[in-house]
Swiss-Prot record:
Function as written in the Swiss-Prot or TrEMBL entry: Catalyzes the transfer of the phosphoribosyl group of 5-phosphorylribose-1-pyrophosphate (PRPP) to anthranilate to yield N-(5'-phosphoribosyl)-anthranilate (PRA).
Lineage summary: Bacteria, Pseudomonadati, Pseudomonadota, Gammaproteobacteria, Alteromonadales
Cofactor(s) essential for the protein: Mg(2+)
Keywords: Amino-acid biosynthesis, Aromatic amino acid biosynthesis, Glycosyltransferase, Magnesium, Metal-binding, Transferase, Tryptophan biosynthesis
UniProt GO cellular component terms: cytosol
Gene name per UniProt: trpD
Residues given in the record as anthranilate 2 binding sites: R182
Species the sequence originates in: Colwellia psychrerythraea (strain 34H / ATCC BAA-681)
Pathway given in the UniProt record: Amino-acid biosynthesis; L-tryptophan biosynthesis; L-tryptophan from chorismate: step 2/5
Name of the molecule in the record: Anthranilate phosphoribosyltransferase
Length: 365
């Protein structure tokens, strides 16, 4: 047994030693090489100088889908486990890479809440702000969501209210080994686009926004390699969301097929709004805006931004035959105020110890 482990470690070490020379020669890594390298990064086994060199070489060359997927699979495997579900159970995420610099309201987070209110199972994976004053974690914390809830509590939230939040730093402790290197480098690297791909709940449906159109195809192909069967990868005229101020470039993943699309607000039966109309603020300011939206009292532009992204999720779940029909469903649920009650239920459940809750339920019986 020990000799097998030693041989395996020796093989990984040999692989790591070939990675930088391969990249310096302008060649791509295969998925296994990328996986093994990032696996060692997460265990603290990679020298900071080598890590910085490899990240820089990947950046200069341009990361391939295999390199992205290999890293993502390694990171997800090393994450704190989320309770397994039945293979036929559908779970989705609505997430962006960040980095678009637009400082909009929290569109993807709010769309995820609305989608949960529409009956979809949403496991939202997120962090604090990257490209704005308020990230998904900042917003949900402002509402009172317990970011440090256990995986069991998060799973209970998902079962009870169709919604949970997985705070990235609570699941990906191995990132601490890369933190100082990333900070010293001061540039975007592969790590900046991995967040949407490493959700520990392993969603099988995704609405994934990217900050540049150059990432559309690589991220779509990487999603396929990580096992996602149904998704939209989108870039909306400068945003990592579906846009209202212009067209959205999209790649639809449909069971192995990649379909390039251009989507406009009119495809949802809506009109255009300016980017200025959906600008956000601090977490507290955004929380007030989101509370109005989810209670059915939001401004038209804010509502529309959330509706189009929620509608895309409904369409991917085959809850509607067209984006227009999906938008109508999202609009009806939004007007009902059910979105806010869904979020407030998440707040309540996230602050309960699921083990004690289950004990109380047994006692009641």
């Amino acid at each position: 047994m020990a000799s097998t482990s030693a041989a395996s470690n020796e093989l990984v070490s040999s692989t790591i030693n070939t990675i930088l020379p391969t990249l310096v020669d302008g060649l791509d890594l295969n998925q296994r090489q990328s996986h093994d390298f990032f696996q060692q990064v997460l265990q603290g086994n990679i020298d900071p100088a080598l890590m910085a060199s490899v990240l820089t070489a990947l950046k200069i060359k341009g990361e391939t889908p295999e390199e992205i997927a290999g890293a993502a699979i390694a990171i997800r495997a090393a994450a704190t486990p989320f309770p397994e579900r039945n293979k036929e159970d559908i779970v989705a995420d609505c997430v962006g890479t960040g980095g678009d610099g637009a400082n909009t309201i929290n569109i993807s987070t709010t769309a995820a809440v609305l989608a949960a209110a529409c009956g979809l199972k949403m496991a939202k994976h997120g962090n604090r702000s990257v490209s704005s004053m308020s990230g998904s974690a900042d917003l949900l914390e402002a509402f009172g969501v317990n970011l440090s809830m256990s995986p069991e509590t998060a799973n209970h939230c998902l079962a009870q209210t169709n919604l949970c939040f997985l705070y990235a730093p609570a699941y990906h402790s191995g990132f601490k080994y890369a933190g100082p290197v990333r900070k010293a480098m001061g540039i975007r690297t592969l790590f900046n686009i991995l967040g949407p791909l490493v959700n520990p709940a392993k969603p099988n449906i995704m609405l994934l926004g990217v900050y540049t159109p150059e990432l559309l195809m690589p991220m779509a192909q990487a999603l396929q390699l990580t096992g996602v069967k149904r998704a939209f990868v989108v870039h909306g005229s400068g945003l990592d969301e579906i846009a209202l101020h212009g067209n959205t470039q999209a790649i639809e993943i449909n069971n192995g097929e990649l379909i390039e699309r251009t989507i406009s607000p009119q495809d949802f039966g809506l009109k255009n709004y300016t980017l200025e109309e959906i600008k956000g603020g601090t977490p507290a300011e955004n929380a007030d805006i989101i509370r109005d939206i989810l209670s059915g009292q939001g401004k038209d532009a804010h509502n529309a931004a959330v509706i189009v992204n929620c509608a895309a999720l409904l369409y991917l779940h085959d809850k509607a035959e067209s984006l227009t029909q999906a938008a109508q469903l999202a609009t009806e649920v939004l007007a009902s105020g059910k979105g806010l009650s869904t979020l407030l239920t998440l707040v309540k459940l996230s602050n309960q110890d699921v083990s004690s809750t289950q004990t109380e339920l047994k006692a009641d019986k």
